[in-house]
């Protein structure tokens, strides 16, 4: 039989029924308590002690430390509902409680729960069920919208539903939202959705029915928020696939947070064709924002170029790295700005120092507009605006192309700064109830109350002095006790002089006590001055915030200008510190010509001068200029492990990417034609959760490249074909090479240990190798890329460096010697003249022709070495020998 529930538990269950998806923080005195399965889950996530009361699992956290635990739950992708006590506890009665706030990973606005240098995006995705005109013509489209409520940044894009899996994964990987709203029917339409979402385990997922994505309602909500009659100014209409998810985001923000979101004043629409395409594998393999080892920013490209001084600049730098430009003109505009700071080191140093004193204007103004702020925020904004004004004067003097404000905007900037200077007390705290919020002289009402609070004794003394003069009672006194409060005491000898407006309160043996209406008012003012001061200051503070919030659009624009300046000075600083050069961009030529290129990350972690620079020159296939026919488009790169192949591959891709985000590059010289896509297939791991082997993952990535690359792409491939038999791997590697070379004609760097590929003959192929110095049985990796094909992979040497036992190394050397001797014998036999009248056998099928570069004897030798005589049945052995004999004789 179930035990009867207490009134408090019935109250908990009643509130919990309304917040089924949230973790309910139920306030009990000085703790927030959780119960039942929720307590079990929270105790596991937060590593709390799980207890029981009346067989009910429970755990709790101190309310004063709640922010620490809330932050951890948000990072784990959880929603939290804060349930507070809203009435004072009554003996024997039940305290009233209600949910005062719901916090979710994508709607949180408090600094304590945010990463300063990263956006906190809330996203929504929708698939249209009717054809519309979009970036790729007339088609069925999916729309993706995402917003950072803390900054007001609002973006949306669309892509054909036929590309949903690739494009959705690509965009989600780029923006890394903390929370996403998903159209329910997408699960059925795209079974791969579950697979994609599993890649982002900490991203909170909310599924909404299709009717929630109503285009008409979404358009109305967007227009209402933006204050416009239609969405034409944002290149949108009711049929745009971006509209339904964007509208739902605003609805969700209003419902969950209950805040004013009027600071969200517009939305930026973009197309994939505006930016370089970077698939998920490429972003990870190039370690753009995080490294592959521990997923931290250390040893990433972001770390190598991040010399930003503001949180806004850091966030913009992340976005620029994730979204390189395709347009030569836009890239050159960015490079011009970097160059202006690169050339003027003195101005750049002053700008860097000034930027260091600018706080997060984007999020400060966002919190002010949402009325989620305090006095310290306003002081931080004032400090930041002062720094912007100082920096603006220097920029004008130097005629630099930054902080482009017109006269009206400059005036507004000064007015906002002056309002903050005059209104907010420099000694204020984050508390809004300590009476130290509003500066003296700004509000007459506040000043009056402060005067009463701070000068109560002087006010009473002045009143007493006035009454003495009016009554002529020189020994009139003001006294105080808890029972009567303040009162006037008149000695019996002066009772006859007491005026009519004195109100008798009590008679004593030697004196009488009186009050007056004026004294009552003074007492009331003194007793209530603290409460009245808090109310008055809060009223004035809200007025100041409302005024500043009304200029959020301007402050957001100002923040964007500061962020852009910060990113450009960061690029200039990287160029100065690491001797980077400005790349030269060429339109549509397909050229990639890097002289003395270096890996930006590896070089940063070596001693100065230790990194060995290398050059590469490639040109996309099919060029009209006859002189260009001698420039290769496809580089086959061979060399030992640890010689530097992967570093060379990645540095080439990173130099291209750096150029297209508008940065100088680590090279003596770089002449580049902007690429439309960068593919980087280097290394692979299995995906056991999906049932995918390492080889299958590699083939999936390779297939995506072959189906997506264009002539204007840059393709980086390392060790294609490994993970299967040598015959299959070699065949796949050659077939992939031929397709890239003859069909796609993209600029390609193809690293391999299949040395047979170096025998491919084509006017657009170049063989490159990593040079090695061999002397006295030892080898030195020179890290230098030179023309030619490697003759040895030195795998046994590298195995020795890794600590493989000497007995194993010796056996490997013997096997390698046997194989090389066998190969020599075959070479001698092939060199002998053929019998008179005999004809050379030619391949009889396309498949045989495709494999003509792969010596049959090497394949057979590999089979012999892998066959164990002790484990092979006699009949099987005879069959193998007959097969080898026939293949060697060409039958």
Swiss-Prot record:
Annotated spans, Disordered: 827-854
Listed GO biological process terms: mismatch repair
SMART domains for the chain: MUTSac, MUTSd
Coiled coil: none
Keywords assigned: ATP-binding, DNA damage, DNA repair, DNA-binding, Nucleotide-binding
Pfam families reported for this sequence: MutS_I, MutS_II, MutS_III, MutS_IV, MutS_V
UniProt cross-references to PROSITE patterns, sorted A to Z: DNA_MISMATCH_REPAIR_2
SUPFAM superfamilies on file: DNA repair protein MutS, domain I (SSF55271), DNA repair protein MutS, domain II (SSF53150), DNA repair protein MutS, domain III (SSF48334), P-loop containing nucleoside triphosphate hydrolases (SSF52540)
GO molecular function: ATP binding; ATP-dependent DNA damage sensor activity; damaged DNA binding; mismatched DNA binding
Entry protein name: DNA mismatch repair protein MutS
Source organism: Treponema denticola (strain ATCC 35405 / DSM 14222 / CIP 103919 / JCM 8153 / KCTC 15104)
């Amino acid at each position: 039989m179930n035990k009867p529930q207490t009134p408090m538990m019935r109250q908990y269950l009643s509130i919990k029924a309304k917040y089924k998806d949230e973790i309910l923080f139920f306030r009990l005195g000085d703790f927030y308590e959780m119960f039942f399965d929720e307590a079990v889950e929270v105790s596991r996530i937060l590593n709390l002690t799980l207890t029981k009361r009346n067989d009910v699992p429970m755990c709790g956290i101190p309310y004063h430390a709640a922010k620490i635990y809330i932050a951890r739950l948000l990072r784990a992708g959880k929603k939290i509902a804060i349930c507070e006590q809203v009435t004072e506890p009554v003996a024997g009665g039940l305290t009233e409680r209600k949910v005062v706030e719901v916090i979710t990973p994508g709607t949180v606005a408090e600094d304590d729960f945010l990463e300063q240098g990263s956006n906190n995006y809330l996203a929504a995705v929708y698939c249209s069920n009717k054809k519309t005109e979009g970036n790729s013509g007339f088609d069925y489209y999916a729309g993706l919208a995402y917003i950072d409520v803390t900054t007001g940044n609002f973006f949306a894009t669309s892509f054909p539903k036929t590309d949903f899996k690739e494009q959705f994964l690509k965009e989600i990987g780029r923006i890394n939202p903390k929370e996403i709203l998903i159209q329910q029917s997408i699960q059925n339409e795209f079974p791969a959705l579950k697979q994609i979402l599993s890649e982002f385990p900490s991203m909170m997922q909310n599924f909404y029915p299709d009717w929630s994505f109503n285009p008409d309602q979404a358009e109305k909500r967007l227009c209402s928020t933006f204050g416009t009659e239609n969405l034409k100014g944002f290149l949108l209409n009711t049929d745009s696939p971006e509209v339904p998810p964007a509208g739902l985001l605003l609805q969700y923000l209003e419902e969950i947070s209950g805040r004013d979101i009027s600071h969200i004043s517009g939305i930026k629409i973009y197309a994939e064709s505006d930016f370089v395409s970077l698939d998920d594998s490429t972003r990870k393999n190039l370690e753009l924002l995080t490294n592959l080892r521990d997923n931290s920013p250390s040893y990433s490209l972001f770390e190598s170029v991040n010399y930003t001084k503001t949180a806004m600049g850091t966030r913009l730098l992340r976005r620029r790295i994730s979204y390189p430009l395709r347009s030569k003109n836009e890239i050159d505009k960015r490079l011009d700005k970097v160059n202006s700071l690169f050339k003027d080191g003195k101005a750049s140093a002053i700008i860097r120092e000034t930027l260091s004193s600018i706080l997060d204007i984007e999020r400060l103004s966002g919190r002010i507009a949402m009325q989620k702020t305090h006095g310290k925020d306003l002081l931080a904004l004032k400090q930041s605006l002062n720094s912007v004004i100082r920096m603006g004067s220097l920029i004008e003097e130097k005629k630099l192309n930054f902080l482009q404000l017109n006269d009206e905007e400059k005036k507004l900037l000064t007015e906002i700064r002056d309002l903050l200077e005059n209104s907010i007390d420099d000694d204020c705290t984050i508390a809004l109830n300590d009476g130290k919020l509003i500066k003296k002289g700004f509000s007459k009402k506040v000043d009056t109350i402060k005067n009463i609070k701070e000068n109560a004794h002087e006010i009473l003394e002045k009143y007493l002095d006035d009454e003495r003069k009016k009554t002529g009672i020189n020994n009139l006194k003001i006294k105080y006790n808890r029972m009567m409060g303040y009162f006037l005491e008149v000695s019996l000898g002066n009772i006859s002089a007491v005026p009519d407006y004195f109100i008798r309160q009590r008679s004593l043996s030697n004196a009488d006590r009186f009050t007056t209406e004026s004294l009552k008012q003074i007492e009331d003012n003194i007793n209530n001055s603290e409460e009245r001061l808090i109310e008055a200051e809060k009223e004035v503070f809200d007025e100041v915030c409302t005024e500043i919030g009304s200029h959020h659009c301007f402050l957001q624009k100002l923040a964007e200008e500061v962020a852009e300046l910060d990113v450009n000075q960061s690029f200039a600083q990287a160029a100065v510190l690491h001797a980077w050069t400005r790349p030269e961009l060429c339109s549509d030529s397909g050229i990639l010509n890097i002289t003395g290129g270096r890996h930006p990350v590896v070089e940063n972690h070596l001693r100065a001068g230790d990194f060995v620079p290398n050059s590469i020159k490639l040109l996309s296939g099919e060029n009209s200029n006859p002189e260009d026919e001698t420039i290769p488009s496809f580089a086959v790169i061979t060399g030992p492990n640890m010689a530097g192949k992967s570093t060379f591959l990645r540095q080439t891709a990173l130099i291209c990417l750096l150029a297209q985000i508008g940065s100088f590059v680590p090279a003596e010289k770089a002449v580049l034609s902007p690429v439309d896509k960068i593919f980087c297939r280097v290394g692979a791991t299995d995906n056991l959760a999906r049932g995918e082997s390492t080889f299958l993952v590699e083939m999936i990535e390779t297939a995506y490249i072959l189906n997506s690359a264009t002539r204007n792409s840059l393709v980086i491939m390392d060790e294609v074909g490994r993970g299967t038999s040598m015959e299959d791997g070699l065949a796949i590697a050659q077939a992939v090479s031929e397709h890239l070379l003859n069909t796609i004609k993209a600029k390609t760097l193809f690293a391999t240990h299949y040395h047979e590929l170096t025998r491919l003959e084509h006017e657009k192929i170049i063989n490159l190798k990593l040079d090695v110095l061999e002397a006295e049985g030892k080898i030195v990796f020179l890290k230098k890329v030179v023309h030619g094909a490697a003759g040895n992979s030195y795998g046994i040497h590298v195995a020795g460096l890794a600590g493989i036992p000497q007995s194993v190394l010796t056996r490997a050397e013997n096997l390698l010697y046997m194989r090389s001797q066998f190969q020599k014998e075959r070479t001698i036999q092939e060199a002998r003249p053929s019998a008179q009248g005999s004809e050379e056998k030619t391949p009889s099928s396309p498949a045989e022709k495709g494999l003509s570069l792969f010596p049959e004897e090497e394949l057979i030798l590999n089979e012999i070495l892998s066959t164990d005589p002790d484990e092979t049945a006699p009949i099987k052995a005879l069959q193998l020998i007959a097969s080898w004999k026939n293949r060697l004789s060409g039958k």
